[in-house]
Amino acid sequence: MTKNISINLLKHISPSAFLEKYWGKQALFLQDAIDISGAELSKDVVFGLAKNENIESKIIAFIGGSQQTTYGPFNKVKYGKSSSLLIHQFNLIHEFSYNLFQSINFVPYCLHDDVMMSFSSEGGGVGPHSDSYDVFLVQGQGEKVWNIGATDKKAFKTTSTDHSNLKFTPTEQFLAKPGDILYVPPFTPHHGISLSDDCVTYSIGFRSPSNNEIRNQYLEYLMDRKDKSNDLFNGLDLNENTKALIPNSLASFIKKNTAFPKNPLIIDDFIGCFLSEPHEGAFFTKKNITKNAFKKIDIEKILRLNIQTRAVIHNENFYINAENIFVANKDRMFFEELFNQKKILITPSKANDSLVEVMIYLLSEGYITFNKHRFML
């Protein structure tokens, strides 16, 4: 399934107008946005994936008016009416989903998260809910009716942890057919119900880091930096009459060591590391690559980013999987193309020494590869 995907947003609205008017602000329904033919999924194939212990899956079923969720892997998939089987990171499994995700190229790679596939029976869905991120809901097969409510950040804060079974008054309703796309911004309640069996919806999710997430990640980043000075407090103030009083010198020492660094170089480095952090659960197979073996390759080959690699550029620095890699000035154009296009042609035997050094490290870590990713579907 190597079909190239073209999301025809331009038929409805330009990417710049979409970002200005809709992204993060209001829902948008796009009819006949893509050609979905050739991407059909069968129940046997999807159920087989749900039995795989390396694939995250769950079933949401509505029985007697109540929602029940069970988590995979499943020895036997129990799937009846009003049920949905969800498979996460489907873009690593399904080539069509991967191409679909990559086609939304007006959103920076650093905000790409994953594609979740839902396979529903008639009446199935995940229940009314609201998300803290932007999502494109692509109808793959079958039909689904969507009810959309008004965007309400305050309501999102006060609902349950998973924000499911959210009660809201629909303000819009859409009937999604194969090839249709519904964009839903954060904090916007929505509820989709399948109108047929074997109904497939691809949920393309994007990262929307919260202020709390950024602060927590920044603290972890600072902890990982490990201040090599290893200063100890040893400057007591002498005050015999108020022994319960915390010494000013101790309070000052603590303030000094708990204040966030204001060095812009540190903050910029954190931004690059944070936004290139690979998806949770990403796995990279290390290899033993030698310089001699690399330089012996005297034919032009396609070098690719590992499908799980996150690579970003920030303030002229290159970050890959939360690592800042040194790139010589003469190699910058090479890495700009690799990071932006996710692949590049290279003849290793003709590569200069500085480029070879970085290539060997990245190949050894499994961050880049000469091999094309093998999709299961």
Where are the language model's segments positioned?
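Acidic, low-complexity/disordered tracts enriched in E/D and polar residues
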Residues: 261-337, 360, 371-377
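Long, charge-rich alpha-helical interaction segments
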Residues: 218-276
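Fe(II)/2-oxoglutarate
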Residues: 1-27, 321-330, 364, 369-376
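Short acidic, hydrophobic short linear motifs in intrinsically disordered regions
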Residues: 330-351
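Short amphipathic alpha-helical interaction segments
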Residues: 350-364
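Active-site region of the double-stranded beta-helix
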Residues: 2-21, 34-180, 188-236, 372
